From Swiss-Prot:
The keyword Secreted applies. Belongs to the aerolysin family. InterPro entries: Aerolysin/haemolysin_CS, Bi-component_toxin_staph, Leukocidin/Hemolysin_toxin, Leukocidin/porin_MspA_sf. Gene3D superfamilies: Leukocidin/porin MspA. Changing residue 285 to I/P/R/S: Nearly wild-type oligomerization, hemolysis and target cell binding. It comes from the Bacteria. The mushroom-shaped heptamer is composed of a cap domain (comprising 7 beta sandwiches and the amino latches of each protomer), 7 rim regions whose protruding strands may interact with the membrane bilayer, and the stem domain (52 Angstroms in length, 26 Angstroms in diameter) which forms the transmembrane pore. Self-assembles to first form a non-lytic oligomeric intermediate, and then, a mushroom-shaped homoheptamer structure of 100 Angstroms in length and up to 100 Angstroms in diameter. Interacts with human ADAM10; this interaction is required for toxin pore formation, disruption of focal adhesions, and hly-mediated cytotoxicity. It comes from Staphylococcus aureus. Its main location: secreted. This is Alpha-hemolysin.
Amino acid sequence: MKTRIVSSVTTTLLLGSILMNPVAGAADSDINIKTGTTDIGSNTTVKTGDLVTYDKENGMHKKVFYSFIDDKNHNKKLLVIRTKGTIAGQYRVYSEEGANKSGLAWPSAFKVQLQLPDNEVAQISDYYPRNSIDTKEYMSTLTYGFNGNVTGDDTGKIGGLIGANVSIGHTLKYVQPDFKTILESPTDKKVGWKVIFNNMVNQNWGPYDRDSWNPVYGNQLFMKTRNGSMKAADNFLDPNKASSLLSSGFSPDFATVITMDRKASKQQTNIDVIYERVRDDYQLHWTSTNWKGTNTKDKWTDRSSERYKIDWEKEEMTN
């Protein structure tokens, strides 16, 4: 099931000009993820598969890799769900009011959330990244230590033995120039990450953020010139001079660990995977002497939700 939520202020012009923007390509590292069943020793196997969903209307490509870890020496089964794909940026002009005023919709945040219904026996036991991330790049290799726990090695080592642990075939990696990752209040039933805009240098000026303000020029985050003789729609910063996430979108790479009691009477679980894009409204207008910018936060939210079914006995995940 795919759903879409757009706040009531969304205009018809915005829907027509932005939502049909094609989805950016998925990360090429997907080809390195091995599917099938692997014996990692100590009476333990890892079974990996993948599921792909395209939501063209919202510009979202969801690719979910899942790995069942069956350790016969442990009383719980484990499932690692890795959420990848691309959430398109959709940075573009959406309105023009003559030559002196224009609006730009731009992605101020990207979100990925996983939710188990409250009545499910299964629980979320871990997640990666486990903390907020403010570096440009995040990388972590997931390993299993034959103790019922999956851990992440942030040094990014790939494959084989890592200390006393064994790689389960997943090295998380994503980039977020000018953005930062915030872990959103995880519980045993839900976890989410918000990759939110931090600040950006505009043509060697700034840095500017969503709240920057100058008494004369206002917010200059996406202002190409202060006094240029041009239409307002032509005075927005070129996408290739801004963060790549604005034009190309964000390619998430998060992991969630779910545990299930082997003795539970019901060995099936439902889980919802939700991708979101939040957009701000950046406006430019001519004051008679110069350009002035304003930024309205969180004006539009685009949401795509998919329910997956987990079969712990068959070690399968379907949608």
